[in-house]
Amino acid sequence: MKMNYEELKTANATPAAASMVETFRAMGYSLETAMTDILDNSISAGANNIWISRIWKGGQSIITIKDDGIGMNHQELIEAMRPGSQNPLEERSKSDLGRFGLGLKTASFSQCRRLTVYSKKADYKPVYWTWDLDYVAKTNQWELLQWIPDEYINALDDVSHGTLVIWSGLDRIINPETSEIDINSKVKFSSLLDNVKRHISMTFHRFIEEKVVRIFWCEHEIEPWNPFCENEPKTQIRPTENIIGGISVKGYVLPHKVRSLAKQPMLKQKVLMDGQLSKDSMYIEEKDYF
């Protein structure tokens, strides 16, 4: 049945901002998947280098992700900060790893109460905007704040174009009341982020191996970790099978028992990552990207 919208009454049903952002915070992200979602954006923006930093300040600790991608101008940044900024029905380039225009916001909100994005596009002035969930809760409005921590105002001076994502108010990672001298909390914070580093080395191993991007963790370059252990002598590689829809399946059989791990570093890392060699796993990769 064809609708004649001009003859119908309407009512505004704009979602309440304070309630909606709390819903965004509960979309099932772990710290690992949240940070890799941000890295997806950097790669989609054509970054050759990504720098990840963590600054311990107790409950005021900060995590930053900086890239040398194409960057954004003022209007582009506001659009990127808008929830649902991308229509999933629109055609995407094969290098675009996003889909709904929610990842930057939902991934960040799942871990922190304050998301600042500072970006510089070639031939444009640097721009920054912040989502502050405490401000949203207070005003119940979808309003950004033009604010950036003072210590980061010159953070893009060393790149001609790029973007810096700043997470502060990390209430899902650390108690806001935590003291900077709390050693146990500092160790826990470091341990959580070490897990993220390992996750990144696995999730983006193809990108790193193919030299699509270099990822630096606290100034040290992350090495790729290939979960298939293809270069290990005792790994059995099965023939590739092509199935419906252009999907190909390839099997890898790793040694059942842990032997001579010192001589087989990838297997040793497999034990550290998975906990056991006998664990069956399936990995889905967007191979056409490369």
State the predicted function of each range.
Residues 90-219:
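GHKL-type ATPase core
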Residues 48-50, 59, 113, 161-163, ...:
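Residues at beta-strand starts and edge strands
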Residues 1-58, 75-78:
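Bergerat-fold GHKL ATPase/HATPase_c domain
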Residues 185, 189, 197-198, 208-290:
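GHKL/Bergerat-fold ATPase module in large chromosome/replication-associated machines
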Residues 73-75, 169, 174-176, 224-226, ...:
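Short helix/loop capping segments that flank catalytic or ligand/cofactor-binding pockets
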Residues 43-92, 99:
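Conserved beta-strand-loop-beta-strand hairpin that lines the nucleotide-binding pocket
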Residues 55-57, 68-70, 112, 120-122, ...:
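An acidic- and aromatic-residue-enriched active-site/binding cleft used to recognize and process polar
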